[in-house]
Amino acid sequence: MVSQSRSKVIKDFIEYYPKYSTPEKTYRDMIKEKGYTHSQQTTKDTQWDILNFMIDEQMKYTREDYVIFDRCPIDNIAYSIWACAKQESDIDTEFVEKCMPLVKESMKFLDIIFFTPITKVAKVELEDNDERDVDPVFVEEIDHLLKAIKKDWDQNHDSKFFEHDDRPAMIDIFGNPNERIQISKLYLDADGDCIGETDSPLVTEEELREMEYYKYKFGISDDKTKALNDPKGLDGGYK
């Protein structure tokens, strides 16, 4: 199962990997049904129900299913952390700490998280509708939080977000539709299976250089990260 953090990427992904499908219902449908406020106006009830909805959706599938989710519990906890820091809602530290173990456990049921970071040369286009808050300051602050979680994935052996020995790969994906697919091909074979978990060959040195090229081209700087060479975090020797 794969999670991605931008809806447009999902459409491009499924066009290239037709084995994959998306759940019929998303957390956005639940928000509408319950009339919840969200994003900058989110509350404990909203965040708690979104988190449980996301986890329940993950539980409907097995490792044999080809499913791609638009957002995952990592996105949910980032919004909760943001709201807690702003102190403008009922979300507090106690609530965030209550959610963290659920988020961490839920990560065991994902194979890959494709993360679409915002960079100066690879900006993410957002649709201005009632489903998303497109306030640029808010979007940038959430992006910074997600990048911090990604850095935690890269460097922290004792992460609060991920179980080190049982966690999904977390991969930056950026650029135009074709470039996004080229990056995904470094981690998924033609059938959409994770490379290294089937009989598919491991990522080659040439492919690693290609990935570094894309990261350089789009201003992704992570000289300290080891995720590229160890996307599943199998090397327990670093923190």
Language-model features: locations:
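Glycine-rich phosphate-binding P-loop
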Residues: 1-13
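Short catalytic/ligand-binding loop motif for oxyanion handling, primarily in non-cytosolic enzymes
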Residues: 5-6, 75-79, 85, 122-125, ...
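Conserved substrate/cofactor phosphate-moiety recognition/catalytic segment
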Residues: 11-56
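Short, well-ordered alpha-helix to beta-strand connector turns
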Residues: 17, 64-65, 110-111
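Short loop/turn segments at strand-loop or loop-helix junctions that form parts
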Residues: 25, 70-73, 79, 114-120
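Glycine-rich phosphate-binding loop used to anchor ATP phosphates in small-molecule kinases
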Residues: 46-107
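A glycine- and Lys/Arg-enriched "phosphate-lid" helix/loop adjacent to the NTP-binding pocket
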Residues: 83-154, 166-175, 198-202
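C-terminal accessory "lid"/substrate-recognition subdomains
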Residues: 151-239
